[in-house]
């Protein structure tokens, strides 16, 4: 029985490339495994007006930019219903700081101050901000520098030219941050906001200004924190459960299918490496439901091998030539494996499009696992079987422990 060199090369690449990806880009762990913070935000209707259809999309985009400023890896930000947003931040160091940053409306306004606590109408707002950053004043204290877009720069120059000697109040969410006296016209669209800032608070405000103001008021409805130690315990328990399941499955395959069972165990190892490698490549976040999806797909991979081996045994018992039995067994097993996996994929599609959070994570991992299990069962297992048959000169009796067959 000949086996093409190209297929052996493919087998090697299927193992080596995912292994490199796993080593260089470890799998992202979700909130329940790594620890972190989950926040539920709700957009508030103003003056009885219903939210516009695209309002939550704008809120999500702005919250995404704010979270990016925190440096959190792989945040999960998704809509829930018509007016809610779920934000999951795994591994965040300061939960309260993150919550404050996410939930702040950050409505920036420039107003001419007319008295101690009175202001004129808004002459410029945060929509004109092009960039914001932290810089130091003459005393080395942090303040926020900002740059305006072209339209904002022209308007800012006009405001400062026509209001010399007056105070220009810089307001954030209705609170005065600073109110410098306009000494001269300010061209170029650059300015600064000073105040009693620490470096961290200045950086947060700069991030808020860069991300932009939320189009509606947001209320924090729920916050939930998961301690990192709980995530570590979950990982430990899950690893133990997965190892026990893997050992039991491996022993079962060895006991029932002998050498072919060992081949199936090797194929399962390839399945695990390839699945993890794909998760790293596409940046999938692994959660506890995702692990459940992986273990379920592992079981489906075992089922596929069982179907294949039973078909091969049927071919052998019919007295066909052994080399033909292997090819025919794989070919006849393929329709049953395909049908079973397609029905599972249809279910995962429903879960992904109509589910939220953990349910979608489960669906994504299960989908990856099902696709990989089909590939490993039909292609990888066949290559390994033929390699074993060629090297060890196996027949039906040696491969499956069948008596009285060649």
Swiss-Prot record:
Span-the-membrane segments of this chain are: 8-28, 240-260, 262-282, 289-309, 334-354, 361-381
Q: Which PANTHER family match?
A: PROTEIN TRANSLOCASE SUBUNIT SECD, PROTEIN-EXPORT MEMBRANE PROTEIN SEC
Question: What is the membrane topology noted in the UniProt record heading this document?
Answer: Multi-pass membrane protein
Gene3D superfamilies named in the record: 3.30.70.3220, Multidrug efflux transporter AcrB transmembrane domain
Q: Function of this protein? A: Part of the Sec protein translocase complex. Interacts with the SecYEG preprotein conducting channel. SecDF uses the proton motive force (PMF) to complete protein translocation after the ATP-dependent function of SecA.
Q: Which GO terms describe its molecular function?
A: protein-transporting ATPase activity
Keyword list (alphabetical) reads:
Cell inner membrane, Cell membrane, Membrane, Protein transport, Translocation, Transmembrane, Transmembrane helix, Transport
Q: Output this protein's name.
A: Protein translocase subunit SecD
What InterPro entries does the database record attribute to this sequence? Acrflvin-R, SecD, SecD/SecF_arch_bac, SecD/SecF_CS, SecD_1st, SecD_SecF_C, SecD_SecF_C_bact, SecDF_P1_head
GO cellular component terms attached to this protein's record:
plasma membrane
**Complex formation:** Forms a complex with SecF. Part of the essential Sec protein translocation apparatus which comprises SecA, SecYEG and auxiliary proteins SecDF. Other proteins may also be involved.
Q: Which family does it belong to?
A: Belongs to the SecD/SecF family. SecD subfamily.
Q: Which GO terms describe its biological process?
A: intracellular protein transmembrane transport; protein targeting; protein transport by the Sec complex
Pfam families listed in its UniProt record:
Sec_GG (PF07549), SecD_1st (PF21760), SecD_SecF_C (PF02355), SecDF_P1_head (PF22599)
> What are the subcellular locations of this protein?
Cell inner membrane
Which top-level group of life is the source organism from? Bacteria
């Amino acid at each position: 029985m000949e086996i093409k060199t190209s297929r052996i090369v493919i087998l090697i690449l299927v193992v080596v490339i995912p292994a490199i990806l796993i080593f260089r880009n470890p799998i992202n762990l979700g909130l329940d495994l790594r620890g972190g913070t989950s926040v539920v935000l709700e957009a508030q209707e103003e003056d009885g007006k219903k939210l516009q259809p695209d309002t939550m999309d704008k809120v999500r985009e702005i919250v995404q930019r704010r979270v990016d400023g925190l440096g959190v890896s792989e945040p999960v930000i998704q809509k829930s219903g018509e007016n809610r947003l779920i934000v999951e931040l795994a591994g965040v160091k300061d939960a309260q700081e993150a919550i404050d940053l996410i939930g702040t409306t950050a409505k920036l306004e420039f107003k001419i101050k007319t008295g101690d606590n009175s202001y004129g109408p808004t002459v410029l707002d945060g929509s004109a901000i092009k960039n914001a950053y932290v810089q130091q004043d003459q005393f080395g204290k942090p303040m926020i520098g900002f740059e305006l877009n072209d339209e904002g720069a022209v308007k800012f120059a006009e405001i400062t030219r026509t209001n010399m000697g007056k105070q220009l109040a810089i307001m954030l969410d209705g609170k005065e941050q600073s109110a410098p006296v306009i000494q001269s016209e300010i061209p170029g669209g650059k300015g600064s906001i000073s105040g009693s800032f620490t470096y961290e608070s200045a950086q947060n405000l700069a991030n808020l200004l860069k991300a932009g103001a939320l189009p509606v008021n947001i209320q924090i409805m729920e916050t939930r924190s998961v301690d990192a130690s709980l995530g570590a315990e979950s990982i430990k328990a899950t690893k133990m459960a997965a190892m026990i399941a893997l050992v039991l499955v491996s022993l079962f395959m060895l006991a029932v299918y002998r050498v072919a069972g060992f081949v199936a165990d090797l194929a399962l190892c390839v399945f695990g490496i390839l699945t993890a490698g794909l998760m790293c490549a596409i940046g999938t976040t692994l959660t506890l439901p995702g692990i459940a999806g992986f273990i379920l797909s592992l079981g489906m991979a075992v089922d596929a091998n069982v179907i294949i081996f039973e078909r091969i045994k049927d071919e052998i018992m019919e007295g066909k030539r052994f080399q033909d039995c292997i090819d025919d067994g794989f070919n006849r097993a393929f329709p049953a494996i395909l049908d079973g996996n397609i029905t599972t994929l249809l279910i995962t599609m429903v879960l992904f499009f109509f589910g939220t959070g953990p349910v979608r994570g489960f669906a994504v991992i299960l989908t990856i696992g099902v696709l990989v299990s089909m590939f490993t069962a039909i292609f990888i297992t066949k290559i390994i079987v033929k390699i074993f048959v060629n090297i060890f000169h196996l027949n039906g009796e040696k491969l499956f422990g069948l008596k009285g067959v060649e």
